Amino acid sequence: VEEGFPASRCAAESRAVRASDIASVLYTSGTTGQPKGCLLSHRYELAAGQWYASRGGAIAFDEGVERIYNPLPLFHVNASIFSFYCAMLKGNCQVQTDRFQVSRWWTEVYESKATVVHYLGVVVPMLLSQPAHPHERAHTVRFAIGAGVEPQRHAAFEERFGFPLIEIWGMTEIVRAIVDNEAPREI
């Protein structure tokens, strides 16, 4: 017992962890109504990471070399489950910043040597509205994955910054997502 903390009055349960056991509680974004708490099992979290890691096409992950930059919060399924478990299962690295800040984006992407970046729809117009940055083309990013970018912004972003925006859509409640990762992409 650490100094200053009282000893527990009850013994911890000792048993093997099962795939069906609750691993986390995440709240939905409220897209289909009020946000709701989702009890997510270990099976769910591993399946989501495996799904993302195995998509291939425009979002093929190599083993042991990818650096996934994710500025999204860890209370969201994107950062805490999809990219985290994908990185873990493929022996890669997740670069987790404290929060998205447009003024730090290119410096963090460049300095972290990110090969994959995650975004939400609001990120793209913010980056496009910024003056040219020395690192906006001097990076190692192969693709970005996220949701909510208006179709007309894709071409401008991809031309200016040199990598594709891959749209994904999913629901925290059901561990299912769809992604436009095969050519020809329908934006």
Predicted regions and their residues:
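Generic structural marker for isolated residues within well-ordered, non-membrane alpha-helices
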Residues: V25, S83, V124, H154
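A secondary-structure boundary/capping signal
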Residues: S41, P71-P73, D98, L120
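Conserved adenylate-forming
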Residues: R9-S20, V25-N70, K90-N92
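Conserved S/T- and glycine-rich ATP-binding loop of Class I adenylate-forming
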Residues: I22, T28-T31, I68, L74, ...
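Gly/Ser/Thr-rich phosphate-binding loop
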Residues: L89, W106, E111-Y119, L128-I187
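Short beta->alpha linker loops
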Residues: Y44, F100-Q101, V122, V149
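Conserved AMP-binding/adenylation subdomain of ANL enzymes
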Residues: L46-R67, F75-V116, M126, Q130
